[in-house]
């Protein structure tokens, strides 16, 4: 157990995959998973941590299959952006039910549904202790929600991007296929590139590297893992400029 009662981070950008919300359902949003995640985020807020949140849309829409069938990539990406807004609405509602103040911002204008993204307003809301959910990716096609997470993380001057996954961190091989795969506890950005480890897409990863934004990959399905990460305890994989 950590002897340090204070959080290791002041402001974080938490990236959740859309698939994380579907639980064992295989599609859509599992209400029990949504509620558990809202409670874990509430814990961070109660610790005094400022939380920005980016959620993917893969549980509601997957464009790859339709793209193969001939759908225009731009159209598919716009549909994916709307899927992230739907997930954001669900998360905002779950946080409100958990008595956590939250604001949903969209990179594309959706008047009457949620606020349009504003950097100054986002900073103001974070300082006021509200969770800010950033939806619709970057607002541009061809950019992933991982890119959106790194971009928003840099913009709000987050201390770290916390990438929540279904495995315990970054491994030398796929741990689902190889149970003997080795977990890395710490990596430099260059090591990730040299070893061709799958952390996030290259555009997102190099954006984080170029702006010296650390990334911590951890298992959101592991009870208490998010809190341990926040408290600076060894959990998951930390990717940063080693030596800093």
Swiss-Prot record:
PANTHER family (alphabetical): URIDYLATE KINASE, URIDYLATE KINASE PUMPKIN, CHLOROPLASTIC
Localization in the cell: Cytoplasm
Entry EC number(s): 2.7.4.22
Binding-site residues, ATP: 15-18, 58, 62, 165, 171, 174
Function of the protein: Catalyzes the reversible phosphorylation of UMP to UDP.
Record keywords: Allosteric enzyme, ATP-binding, Cytoplasm, Kinase, Nucleotide-binding, Pyrimidine biosynthesis, Transferase
Residues that, per the record, bind UMP: 57, 77, 138-145
Protein name per the record: Uridylate kinase
EC top class named in words: transferase
Pfam family of the protein (one): AA_kinase
Subunit-structure text: Homohexamer.
Catalytic activity: UMP + ATP = UDP + ADP
Taxonomic path: Bacteria, Pseudomonadati, Pseudomonadota, Gammaproteobacteria, Aeromonadales
One GO term describing the cellular component: cytosol
One GO molecular-function entry: UMP kinase activity
Annotated stretches, region: Involved in allosteric activation by GTP: 23-28
CDD domains registered for this protein in UniProt: AAK_UMPK-PyrH-Ec
